[in-house]
């Protein structure tokens, strides 16, 4: 069915969930950890493991708990209907605080116009509540509560989520070894507590993006002293894509581990698309409001006004957008600094504001109206993601005067946001060679006083179109280790075209690898549990456990099947690369058995003799490739 024919039918009648996104992972189950009140139920994924084969000791292996961003979609006990949206997680928490009110209807002019247009009925999400807003004079941001000494339900929720049943894992022996990390000055505790979360938010070192109108949200935290997070981008464009396809991209992305999702739609029906996305999203949704504002003036940047932009902010805040990218650091005086660059201004939002500044020869209205923007943000608890509109678009332009000038301005704006108790993170590059990455991180920590850093990569070289998920994954792992709090994924299609589902998955898995590698290097508590469990499964030839413990079980299983497709290969005591005679792990096990039988320490074994004897034994037993387990 074409996009056009889909839109001819009411989406509220026809929309369906992407079936691939709602399949539970093999040997995994959704578990919920109870908080201090019955409605704090924190979801995690528990991976059940096989018993160690008798040849290797026959021990029971405890299940491994992993962070889960997939929301109710992978819970077989939940009925998913994208036409109705996800269940309500947060309304009771918000009601109990008593500082918000229901509005009689939408406040934004544009929202009212869309609601009154009968032509949009077929596209409109059918179950929309009137929005909330802070009561007059109130501030409903998580930072405001934190600075008042209040531990909110959201703070407790993320503390439980970050720990991932760490105490149980330690008791089960899943963390017998974890290398000490080097955190470059971060203050990572041995256990994440609700009070620690509150302190980090009050300090501005972390944010919980959680708009009061996004009640379907499962809260998460972004900060250098927590697990490194990743963001995935979706959104339609003038080239096409339906609302249903964008919801499918959302559910597919969070299945594979996207901690937040940015809707970067620039095509038709941006307002309606966003409503469907938010109502079906368990993760924070971010936007770049200037994109929609530009659509409202038919793409003519010079026609943008503060009044129109303000209306756009209110429109999106009342829908439930959790964080806004605001390019308020693109100042008139910085624009000429980009003239000698190889790639000029590559940020879409940055180029829009630069064009407006030059056309009017006035200062950026996002900068001059920043206090007014803060007033809107704290009325809905929308977090800032201060955009790097002058980020380098090539390694030749990295760390130049324009980039760092804007960064200093973003530091200034961060302090203004904090005066309003508005949560804030900072966006970063971009394209940066490896030797310059740490300077970026250090400069951001200095200028922005440790506000969370959120970077696009960075890409470490410009010579690999089609492989920029790899060029950027290298930089992402490095900057994550140095202190970056969230990494924006890059797909293989970067610079080339619009990503499809496979590209989205590839980008997310690449960035999950980078984020996890950074967590290991920083020494985040419990980060090595999954590595240890998978390594043990690999050594014991528990093939299914190896697949299921991996970030992408489907691909791992398919690769193994290409070489050894039969079920019997899943219990083989050798790997698919080396075969039975050259498998180092099989040989090591046999050397250990020899040492145990001889009652001597394995390190004292005559390795050559051991290998020779075991090779002879293998031949005498008929060179059997498989053993019953």
From Swiss-Prot:
Catalyses which reaction(s): 5-amino-1-(5-phospho-beta-D-ribosyl)imidazole + S-adenosyl-L-methionine = 4-amino-2-methyl-5-(phosphooxymethyl)pyrimidine + CO + 5'-deoxyadenosine + formate + L-methionine + 3 H(+)
Annotated GO CC locations: cytosol
Organism superkingdom: Bacteria
Pathway: Cofactor biosynthesis; thiamine diphosphate biosynthesis
Gene3D superfamilies per record: 6.10.250.620, Radical SAM ThiC family, central domain
Documented EC number(s): 4.1.99.17
GO molecular function terms noted in the UniProt entry: 4 iron, 4 sulfur cluster binding; carbon-carbon lyase activity; zinc ion binding
Top EC group: lyase
Residues that bind [4Fe-4S] cluster: 575, 578, 583
Note describing how the cofactor binds: Binds 1 [4Fe-4S] cluster per subunit. The cluster is coordinated with 3 cysteines and an exchangeable S-adenosyl-L-methionine.
InterPro entries associated with the record: ThiC (IPR037509), ThiC-associated_dom (IPR025747), ThiC/Bza_core_dom (IPR038521), ThiC/BzaA/B (IPR002817)
Biased composition (Polar residues): 1-13
Annotated binding of Zn(2+), by residue: 431, 495
Binding site for substrate: 233, 262, 291, 327, 347-349, 388-391, 427, 454
Keywords per UniProt: 4Fe-4S, Iron, Iron-sulfur, Lyase, Metal-binding, S-adenosyl-L-methionine, Thiamine biosynthesis, Zinc
Function: Catalyzes the synthesis of the hydroxymethylpyrimidine phosphate (HMP-P) moiety of thiamine from aminoimidazole ribotide (AIR) in a radical S-adenosyl-L-methionine (SAM)-dependent reaction.
Subunit comment: Homodimer.
Similarity comment: family membership: Belongs to the ThiC family.
NCBIfam families: PRK09284.1, PRK13352.1, thiC
Protein name: Phosphomethylpyrimidine synthase
Primary gene name: thiC
């Amino acid at each position: 069915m074409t996009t056009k024919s889909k839109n001819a039918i009411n989406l509220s009648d026809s929309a369906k969930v992407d079936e691939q996104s709602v399949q539970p992972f093999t040997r995994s189950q959704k578990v919920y950890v109870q908080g201090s009140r019955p409605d704090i139920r924190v979801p995690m994924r528990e991976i059940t493991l096989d018993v160690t084969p008798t040849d290797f000791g026959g021990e029971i292996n405890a299940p491994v708990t992993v962070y889960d961003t997939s929301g109710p979609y992978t819970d077989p006990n939940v009925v998913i209907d994208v036409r109705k949206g996800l269940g309500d997680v947060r309304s009771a928490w918000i009601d109990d605080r008593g500082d918000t009110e229901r509005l009689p209807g939408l406040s934004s002019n544009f929202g009212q116009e869309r609601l009154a247009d009968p032509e949009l009925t077929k596209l409109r999400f059918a179950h929309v509540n009137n929005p909330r807003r802070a009561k007059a004079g109130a501030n409903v941001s998580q930072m405001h509560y934190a600075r008042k000494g209040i531990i909110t339900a959201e703070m407790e929720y993320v503390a439980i989520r970050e720990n991932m049943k760490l105490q149980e894992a330690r008791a089960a022996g899943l963390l017998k070894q974890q290398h000490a990390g080097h955190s470059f000055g971060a203050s990572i505790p041995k256990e994440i507590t609700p009070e620690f979360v509150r302190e980090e938010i009050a300090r501005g070192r972390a944010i919980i993006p959680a708009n009061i109108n996004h009640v379907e949200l499962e809260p998460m935290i972004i900060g250098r002293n927590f697990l490194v997070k990743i963001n995935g981008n979706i959104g339609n464009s003038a080239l096409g894509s339906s609302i249903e396809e964008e919801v499918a991209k959302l559910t597919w992305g969070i299945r594979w581990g996207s901690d937040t999702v940015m809707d970067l739609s620039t095509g038709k029906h941006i307002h309606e698309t966003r409503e469907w996305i938010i109502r079906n999203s368990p993760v924070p949704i971010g936007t770049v409001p200037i994109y929609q504002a530009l659509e409202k003036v038919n793409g003519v940047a010079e026609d943008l006004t503060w009044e129109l932009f303000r209306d756009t902010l209110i429109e999106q805040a009342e829908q439930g957008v959790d964080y806004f990218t605001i390019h308020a650091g693109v100042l008139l005086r910085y624009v000429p600094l980009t003239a000698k660059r190889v790639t000029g201004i590559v940020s879409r939002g940055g180029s829009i504001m630069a064009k407006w500044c030059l056309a009017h020869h006035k200062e950026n209205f996002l900068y001059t109206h920043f206090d007014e923007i803060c007033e809107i943000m704290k009325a809905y608890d929308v977090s800032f993601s201060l955009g790097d509109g002058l980020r380098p678009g090539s390694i030749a332009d990295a760390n130049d005067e324009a980039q760092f000038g804007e960064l200093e301005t973003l530091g200034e704006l961060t302090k203004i946001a904090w005066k309003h108790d508005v949560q804030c993170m900072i966006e970063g590059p971009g394209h940066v060679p490896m030797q310059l990455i740490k300077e970026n991180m250090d400069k951001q920590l200095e200028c922005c006083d440790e506000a969370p850093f959120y970077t696009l990569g960075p890409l470490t070289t410009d010579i690999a179109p089609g492989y920029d998920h790899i060029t950027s994954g290298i930089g992402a792992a490095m900057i994550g280790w140095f202190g970056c709090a969230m990494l924006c994924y890059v797909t293989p299609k970067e610079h080339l075209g619009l990503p499809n589902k496979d590209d989205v998955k590839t980008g997310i898995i690449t960035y999950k690898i980078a984020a996890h590698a950074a967590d290991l290097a920083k020494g985040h508590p419990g980060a090595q549990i999954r590595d240890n469990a998978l390594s043990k499964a690999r050594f014991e030839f528990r093939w299914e456990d190896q697949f299921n413990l991996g970030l992408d079980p489907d691909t791992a299983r398919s690769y193994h099947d290409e070489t050894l497709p039969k079920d019997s290969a899943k219990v083989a005591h050798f790997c698919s690369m080396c075969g039975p005679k050259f498998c180092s792990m099989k040989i090591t096990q046999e050397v250990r058995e020899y040492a145990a039988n001889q009652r001597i320490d394995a390190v004292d074994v005559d390795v050559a003799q051991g290998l020779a004897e075991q090779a002879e034994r293998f031949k005498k037993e008929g060179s059997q490739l498989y053993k019953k387990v």
